[in-house]
């Protein structure tokens, strides 16, 4: 992944131009895959059922409250084959609909800062990769379950990197 990202960045006609970096397809796919595996939040805001609804074979009545689980959607194997594997290529081979990829929630209550957050992620990742070599330390090179921090998710322990 790192090698392919560096090759894409090296081929960028204007490597210092943030708008050009923002349009790099593989960089976008890597950021999307990170957000799929590590969404900003696990759950969406509660939604109130306004009229009778059948969803996944279950009936819901007006007044019922539904809460979508972003992580459960992102781990559905029929949408994302081998969902626990980091595979940015999946975002180059398929476009996902608004109900299939929702790292910042969905609908009218989707995070207002989503586009800015993704833009910043791309610029930061490109800048770090072009200037440094990053490696996980042995203590950090093991599965890292998420930890709820208020409404958002974060790592359950520090992520230590060796920077050269």
Language-model segment annotations:
Residues 14-56, 77:
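Conserved cytochrome P450 K-helix E-x-x-R motif and the immediately C-terminal K′/meander segment
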Residues 1, 116-151:
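Cytochrome P450 heme-binding "Cys pocket" and the immediately downstream C-terminal segment
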Residues 55, 61-62:
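Residue-level recognition of short, solvent-exposed, well-ordered loop/turn junctions
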Residues 50, 68-95:
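Conserved cytochrome P450 K-helix/beta-meander segment immediately N-terminal to the heme-binding cysteine loop
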């Amino acid at each position: 992944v790192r090698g392919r990202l560096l090759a894409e960045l090296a081929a960028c006609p204007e490597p210092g131009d943030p708008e050009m970096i923002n349009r790099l397809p593989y960089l976008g796919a890597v950021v999307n895959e990170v957000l799929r595996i590590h969404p900003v939040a696990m759950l969406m805001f509660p939604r109130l059922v306004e009229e009778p609804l059948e969803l996944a074979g279950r009936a819901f009545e007006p007044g019922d409250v539904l809460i979508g689980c972003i992580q459960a959607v992102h781990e559905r194997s029929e949408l994302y084959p081998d969902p626990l594997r980091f595979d940015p290529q999946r975002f180059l081979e398929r476009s996902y609909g608004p109900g299939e990829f929702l790292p910042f929630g969905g609908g009218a209550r989707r995070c207002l800062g989503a586009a800015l957050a993704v833009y910043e992620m791309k610029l930061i990742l490109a800048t770090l990769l072009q200037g440094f070599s990053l490696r996980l330390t042995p203590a950090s090179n093991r599965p890292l379950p998420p930890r709820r921090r208020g409404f958002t998710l974060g790592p359950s322990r520090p992520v230590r990197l060796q920077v050269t």
